[in-house]
Regions:
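Amphipathic, Lys/Arg-enriched alpha-helical "gate/interface" segment within cytosolic domains
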Residues: 2-150
Length: 150
């Protein structure tokens, strides 16, 4: 069954006997100062099909990125991670939380199927601009551009 899920998307699948040791699991999310602004980058990339680990990392990091003192621009890096409906719903629930008002959200490393899942999950729930950009540098530019997040 897993083979069928990943047959067209091998970059999001990795057979690993110790998934908790994957570099994506250990990669830290962080605030990046950029062009006079700040962006929170939530690194969920390189975690392949280990959705439980992705959601656990997201929940752990959410205690930080939902703080009022953290940037209201956020980028979710999802390269080389299998994005499931459960993960999309978890991200949508967190970024639509009333405790934090995000201005701009960018999803980096998504294909058209994943983009459609995010659009459906955020429909009538989002109070912010969001975009899908596969280039990290372009995503940074979009997140800090004045016209995007006003």
């Amino acid at each position: 069954m897993l083979e069928r899920l990943f047959e067209n998307n091998s970059a999001r699948y990795c057979d690993c006997s110790a998934p908790e040791s994957l570099p994506g699991v250990k990669k830290k999310s962080f605030v990046l100062p950029f062009r006079g602004g700040e962006i929170w980058f939530e690194h969920l990339d390189g975690m392949y099909q280990y959705t439980g680990l992705v959601i656990q990392k997201l929940k752990n990091d959410s205690h930080t990125f939902l703080l009022p003192s953290k940037p209201s621009q956020i980028g979710f890096v999802l390269d080389e991670t299998l994005v499931t409906k459960a993960l999309v719903e978890e991200i949508a629930t967190l970024i639509c939380d009333e405790r934090k008002k995000f201005m701009c959200v960018c999803f980096i490393g998504t294909d058209s199927k994943i983009q459609k899942m995010f659009r459906n999950a955020l429909h009538n729930r989002s109070r912010f601009a969001f975009s899908f950009i596969n280039d990290f540098e372009q995503a940074k530019e979009w997140l800090v551009s004045e016209s995007t997040c006003d």
